[in-house]
């Protein structure tokens, strides 16, 4: 396959960054050419306004990194070395109902829930924590096998989705925590990095950068 054919094939499949290698033969000599290129989304992203509906009290000392509603209960992950924690919060009053301090060697980041578990990321420590949702008992830990850092995290019924500070969104097996594949978060003219906390709703992932949403599918470049 030559570079032009490979590029056309990539464009037909998806957006993102691609690395294509081509081998050239001249007699007994073999030459290898590597070419990296980017494919952007076809359309500009939509820009939304918002309306502030209500405000709630919140601990001003909490260095919030992740938020997760389960029914009417708010779970929160706070960061900073020495003050990281996992919390259960009454969002109406701001009262912390349950708090698990994290070892000072970890800076905790995004959280999500999957079935009866809470999953919490660390920033640069290459480890994630799995807790019992009701008791906050630590059930398991896991390593990031491909991504360099832990930033945002969310889930649907089948997978976890994670960001790492780059423009990549990782799809993760919730049983093994293997990073299965990634998609690049792309607009019509830019790759969006530093995408942080995530929430999944109605088939879309809402991501905190300003605030954007993207399809979890690596082949859907329309969102």
Regions found by a protein language model. Give the residues of each.
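Surface-exposed, short loops/turns at beta-strand junctions within beta-sandwich domains
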Residues: 10-16
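Blade/loop signatures of beta-propeller domains
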Residues: 34-49, 82-87
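A short helix->beta-strand "capping" segment at the edge of beta-propeller domains
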Residues: 42-59, 94
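Beta-rich, blade/repeat-based domains predominating
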Residues: 60-70, 104-114, 145-157, 189-203
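Conserved beta-strand positions in repeat-built beta-propeller and related beta-rich domains
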Residues: 76-80, 120-126, 162-166, 207-211
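Short loop/turn segments that connect beta-strands within beta-propeller blades
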Residues: 90-93, 132-135, 174-176
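Blade-loop segments of beta-propeller domains
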Residues: 96-123, 127-128, 138-144
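Conserved small/polar residues in nucleotide/adenosyl-binding loops
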Residues: 213-220
